[in-house]
Amino acid sequence: MEKSENNFAFIDSHNLNLGVKSMGWNLDFKKFRVYLKEKYKVSKAYIFIGFVPGNQRLYDALQEYGYMLVFKPIILGDDKEPKGNIDADLVLRAMIDFHENNFDKAVIITSDGDFYSLVDYFCSKDKLKVVMSPYFKTCSSLLKKTAKEKLVFFNNLQRKLEYKRKSTA
């Protein structure tokens, strides 16, 4: 009997959200969790997110959909926008799970070149399933160069993963 894949997703929530919104649509996180499970055999999906006290309903919903939330206290940037600065947390969690041999392959969801070293390392160890970048135009050239054929974009996923408000008729 063939062993089923056990892949983990590591999601840069801020980058994902901004990237999808820059294309004019909102991601349906419930559909996205199902997509990750079915398409990439993701058994555990971590979302790295800055903690905003007023967003508890969102956090509850994400957990209900099957995500593991990893919070970071936010700070206000120079532009007064909240910043979670989750990069180090995502890399640390991914490396702990790699070191403990907890997953077969990693799905990294970001456009941020700060994750180049992680992606490069996972490629060298044959541990990278795919890098999912929200938007081709905003994806780091470092990620494009490193992930190569293992890089996919959300441009073609809108019909499948777009959040549509339920009509209240």
Predicted regions: what they are:
Residues 1-169:
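Terminal and domain-boundary accessory regions
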